[in-house]
UniProtKB/Swiss-Prot annotation:
Record PANTHER family: COMPONENT OF OLIGOMERIC GOLGI COMPLEX 6 (PTHR21506), CONSERVED OLIGOMERIC GOLGI COMPLEX SUBUNIT 6 (PTHR21506:SF0)
Native source species: Dictyostelium discoideum
UniProt-recorded name of the protein: Conserved oligomeric Golgi complex subunit 6
Gene name per UniProt: cog6
Lipid bilayer topology: Peripheral membrane protein
Family, as annotated: Belongs to the COG6 family.
Cellular localisation: Golgi apparatus membrane
Domain of life: Eukaryota
SMART domains: COG6
UniProt entry tagged with the keyword Transport: yes
Its biological purpose: Required for normal Golgi function.
Amino acid sequence: MNSTLSRKIQKVLDIKLDSEDLSNALEELSTFYTSNSIGARRNLRNEIEKRYLDINIQFLDQFDQLNKNINELVLDFEGIKNSCVDICDHLNSTNRVSSELLKNAHELSCGLKEIKEKENTLQQFFKKFKLTPQEEQSLVKKEIDSSFYQTLDRLSEIQNECKKNLLSNQYQKPTYEILEIITKHQDNAYRRLYQWTKEEIKQLLIIEIPILDSFNNIDQQQQQQQQKVMMLPIALSALQNKPLLFKHCLDEISECRTKTISNGFITALSFGGPNGIPRPIEINAHDPQRYLGDMLAWIHQCLASEFELISTILSKVTIKLNENNNNNVDDNIENNNNNNNNNEELNFIEPIIKVLNNSFECINRPLSIRIDQILQSKPGVIITYKMISLLDFYSRMANLITKGSGVCRVSTIFGSIKSNCLSVFFTQIKDNFDRLERSPTVPSPQDLLPTNDIKDSINKLSELISTFNSSLIPLDEREKEYTPVFSSFIQKIINLTTFSATSSKLPLISMAVFMINCLSSIKSVLENYTSFTASNLELLTCQIEAHMDTLVEEQTSELLQQMGIGPKLSILQYSDNKSPLSQIIAMDRLSIVQSIRQFDNCLEQSFGTLLMPNCEKLSDTTLRSLSKKSVSNLISVAYSSLYSAIHDPFNQYDEPNSIFQYKPDQIKTMLDF
């Protein structure tokens, strides 16, 4: 095979059909090789070379144009280079000329920075130590609102800061100047606030009826007044920093409320309520208890309303006042704030209580005068004590209203009047019992019960203790309150009982029965109140036991005399035990036998139940049974002692067993039965 052909064939076979170059070549060929004719195939090579030549010519044309552009760019670059050289030369020249200017600019820049720092410092200083125009305006504008109090607080902050600076830096002169300006602002502001507060107190607190509801509901009447009411506690709170002005405001409140309370009390006494409802209190002047109760009830209601009213007004006040020295107010506040150990020796009082105490001082005189008039009408002991109980009740209620905030003046007034009533009460008791003792009534020998005077005194005691028991006195204080009032009264009744008994000239046994009946009546009254009458019950029990011993001894002696062995027992009791009883006069065997027979007959006739007329007169059934039993026991013991003496061989009685019909145990059984 022809080698040329072989190379061509081999070349064709070596062609990679998936070659990207082959694909691109064929794709380009399809753009101009549209007809597959013989002529086209023959001219294909020429056509391709022609196209290749055209492409090179186009490339050459483009390259010529690019070359021209590059040459132009080179020329432009040369121009720019020359311009830059000129600029650099100019800049170097300018730099040499303006170096001094730059130096000055740098110095000015540093100076500007320092000025800005000083400006910031001054702004901070003014912000810290100087009021803004708005704040200064809030201190002088007509209406006092929240901005006024904010400025006051700001003044206090500046003042405190100045005081700190006086201790911590060397700029004392400007600090003093600022402090002087701030103090002047403060003084003017507080004086203005004081005047405003004083006027508001006069306008808002002069109301006819001191009821807090009307005070709180002022917004229904007028919106402006509501705002003033809301600002009043804030104003008083701010004035705490000026103790003297604050005290004057408290005095102003007290004065306004004093007028209102005084007028209200006199109106309630003389005219009553609107349209006569409720009726005037003095319409019940004929009934001391009702009269006093109505007056105290009005004061109590008024105190409750006033306490709520003043508590609202002073709700933001936190300081306390020294009650012992009201003049030195600054010292009071300073001591209170320091809260040092010396404060334990001072008597501090809440401002609320101070205002209430001053306000209610006006009721002291009219109330005292009317109670003195009641006492001058000489009411009974019961009425007087009920008045005392009413005063004690409302005194304790007054202390409950003030919640232990301090000494309530109303309670003190009631306590003082109560002391006067107690003096009258004790005088009445003394006069009453002195009158009874001057002409004592003697007991009836038939029943030996308490006389009418003693019964009346015991009934009074019962009513008095019942009144005392219904009081508000705490259980742990009742005995302490009871003793000084009632112990003397009970002792007076006992003394009257003793005086009546001794004046009656009754036998000792009858006097003992009478005393027991009287004392047991008193004891029966006290036994209902054992929680606080224990001391008196113990005293009465001891006295009753003493009189019971007398009664039992006398009744036993009387019965033994009636039964015939009384004389024998007397001889037996006083014998000297040196000689036999049988040799003593009236103690021979025959006399003993006769006495024993008489004793047995009396006992047999009464069937063991002896008549004890004096014991029967005891009104208390328990004491009556106890006395009878005691008498029977003594009789049994007496019989036993006589029986033992007769059977004693030393006494030389013949056949002692034949003398006695009954043994002691039998006698005891008969008496017990």
